[in-house]
C-alpha cells in the first residue's frame, strides 16, 4: 500500500499545524502578573505544553461506531459501516492535577466506509474513584479538524464531548456526535495505548 498526499490531505495537515501554531503563539503572549490568565491564554498554554513537553506517545485504534437506532431509519443503519477500521498516533501528558491533555491524528473508515482523518486536542478531567490509582474515569472534550468524503474533504471544525475508562496504560475513550434524524447521532469509540 502506497501513501500519497493529495491536495486535500495536504490541506488537512496544514490546517492541523495552523491550529497548533495559533495556540502556541497565543501562549507566548503572557498575561500580566496580577491577573488570572484568560481562557485563550490557558488553552494556548495547554496546547503548547502538550506539544513541547509530552510525557507519553499514544496509539489509537478505533473499535466501534454505533448509529443511534432511535434516530435512524432501519434501511439507513443496515447500510452503514459500524466497524471503523483505522489507526492514529498522538502525544499526551498529565498536568499537575492529574488531568489528561493530548494532541492526536487518527484516520478511520466512516459510516460510508470512506476514509476520515481527524486531528486535534483532547482534554479530560480525571478521577480515581478506587484505592487502586491505576483505575481512572475521565470526562472532557476534543477540539480539532476532520475531513469527510460526503463534504468533499473540506476541513470541518469539531468540538465534541469525550469520556474514558482507563486502567494503567490502556484507555477506552468515546464521544457522541449529536445530530438530527438520519444524520449524526453517532457513538464513536476507540482504544488508546500509552507507550
From Swiss-Prot:
Keyword Secreted annotated: no
Top-tier EC class: transferase
Domain of life: Bacteria
Molecular functions (GO terms): acyltransferase activity
Keyword Signal: yes
Site (described: Role in the phospholipid gating): 181
Active site: residue positions: 67, 110-111
Subcellular location: Cell outer membrane
Family affiliation: Belongs to the lipid A palmitoyltransferase family.
Assembly with partners or alone: Homodimer.
Function: Transfers a fatty acid residue from the sn-1 position of a phospholipid to the N-linked hydroxyfatty acid chain on the proximal unit of lipid A or its precursors.
Protein name, per record: Lipid A acyltransferase PagP
Source taxonomy: Bacteria, Pseudomonadati, Pseudomonadota, Gammaproteobacteria, Enterobacterales
Amino acid at each position: 500500500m502506497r501513501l500519497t498526499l493529495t491536495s486535500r490531505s495536504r490541506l488537512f495537515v496544514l490546517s492541523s499545524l495552523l491550529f497548533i501554531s495559533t495556540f502556541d503563539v497565543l501562549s507566548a503572549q503572557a498575561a500580566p502578573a496580577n491577573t488570572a490568565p484568560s481562557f485563550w491564554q490557558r488553552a494556548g498554554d495547554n496546547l503548547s505544553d502538550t506539544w513541547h513537553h509530552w510525557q507519553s506517545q499514544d496509539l489509537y485504534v478505533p473499535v466501534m461506531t454505533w448509529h443511534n437506532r432511535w434516530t435512524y431509519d432501519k434501511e439507513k443503519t443496515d447500510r452503514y459501516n459500524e466497524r471503523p477500521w483505522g489507526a492514529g498516533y498522538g502525544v499526551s501528558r498529565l498536568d499537575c492535577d492529574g488531568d489528561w491533555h493530548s494532541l492526536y491524528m487518527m484516520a478511520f473508515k466512516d459510516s460510508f466506509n470512506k476514509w476520515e482523518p481527524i486531528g486535534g486536542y483532547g482534554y479530560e478531567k480525571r478521577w480515581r474513584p478506587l484505592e487502586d490509582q491505576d483505575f481512572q474515569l475521565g470526562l472532557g472534550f476534543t477540539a480539532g479538524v476532520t475531513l469527510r468524503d460526503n463534504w468533499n474533504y473540506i476541513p470541518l471544525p469539531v468540538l465534541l464531548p469525550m469520556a474514558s475508562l482507563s486502567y494503567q496504560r490502556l484507555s477506552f475513550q468515546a464521544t457522541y456526535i449529536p445530530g438530527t434524524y438520519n444524520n449524526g447521532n453517532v457513538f464513536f469509540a476507540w482504544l488508546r495505548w500509552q507507550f
